[in-house]
Amino acid sequence: KQVNPDMTFWSSPWSPPSWMKVNHYYSVRSNSKVNKLPAEAEITLYEGTDDVDKKFYPKQVAVNDYFIQDPRYLQTYADFFCKFVSAYQEEGVVISRVMFQNEPWAYSIYPACAWTPEGIIRFNVEYLAPTIKKQHPGVQVYLGTLNTNRIELVDKVLSDPRMKDAVEGVGFQWWGGQVLPEIRKKYPNYKYMQTENECGSGTFDWKAAEHTFNLINHYLGNGCEEYTFWNAILCDEGTSGWGWKQNALIRVDSKTGAATYTPEYYAVKHFSNKVVSGTKVLQYKEKGEDNLPVIVFLTPENKYLV
């Protein structure tokens, strides 16, 4: 707060409390190396259906909500969001925005929760949005973080006429970015944001930087007002607690404490050093045969950036 007193935060849970879920466990999928969920518990996810299409993520869609669709549970969970916001406020940390679920279509071995479009609508419209508006009227509710390229799923949620009064914006990440242009064209009245950078595999190289550079162009060029990073600083090989090597903007040697600014850091600086709050996107071109995306900004000082 001393460096940036205007800084605010947004938040989205990976998993509801286990007792609120149909499988009573933090993950959706079983994996003997990282969790203790019995393999037979996965039957709830698809219930024997086999409609698989590898062109999409997820390649198979859950048929059940993993959050118990009981009004008592749904309201209690909405209250939990408010308690979370209040607790951070007491510590001087401003939570300005919440989203109902991190990656509702990631049926993972990590903390996760599968949701159907019907469940997403029900929780956001009937419970989360009205509860937040009542207890924390200054906090925004966004629909996120959407991680599927199955456009029919996103469209089914946003086409419910009640959604426009429940959420102010939509957050996309990973595969969700593929449907951003079409969704924004169909639903132009929402605000849009990118909610998680693709964190790579611990390479910390220029290829990762170029990938992030193109992602920033894509999301900002298609109307997103914010771009969020998953990792700012990691040590050594960038290995997470789950064993996944990832990239970051800054890499620290845990033995010496030496910090290295990675190529990805400079890719980000290319934008953040000039594209300040209030800057507008005038034109955007996706990369084509020339492999070069082009984006034109107008800053609050009426300067053009290309």
Model-inferred region functions:
Residues 104-106, 110, 143, 147-154, ...:
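Active-site clefts of carbohydrate-active enzymes
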Residues 158-170, 218-226:
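Structural recognition of alpha->loop->beta junctions
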